[in-house]
Amino acid sequence: MPRVSRRTAIAVGLTVAAASAVPIQAKAAMYGPDEGEAMEGMEGVRRIALSERETKISGFKTVRLLDLVFQPGAKFPESPMEPMICHMMEGELQIANNGDPFTAKKNDVWTCNAGGTEGAENTAGEPAVMRVAQLIA
């Protein structure tokens, strides 16, 4: 069995202690300003399709997962929505959901009903990413 010097043992111990003290956080992928598909009439808002498949939820044929990337100052006008679940991945947005305003911050989740309306605006100084799971009839 090889002998380990006191100096090596202390160095290894300090390295392990330092590594365990650093918190590791998962971070959502931020997108560049030109990634994805530009949304017509909504300057600074881009759509990135992530996945789509059939659903087993009755009344719906498809579920679609996408990210909406809002550059600072970008606005999505209040418009009719289909059923969906929204999750704030990065940044912060001012949301109007059926006329009720609120601030969506990182990790917030909310829903939209069929026939309801929603608008969003990025009033912060950094890009924001909203992940959307759309339920399509």
Where are these regions (language model features)?
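Ligand-binding loop in jelly-roll beta-barrel domains
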Residues: 115-137
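N-terminal secretory signal peptides and thylakoid transit peptides that target proteins
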Residues: 1-17
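C-terminal segment of N-terminal export signals and the immediately downstream linker at the start
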Residues: 23-54
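Conserved hydrophobic/aromatic beta-strand scaffold that supports enzyme active sites
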Residues: 65-67, 85, 109-111, 132
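Glycine- and acidic-residue-biased ligand/ion/polar-headgroup-sensing regions
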Residues: 81-99
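Conserved short histidine dyad/triad with adjacent acidic residue
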Residues: 64-80, 113-114
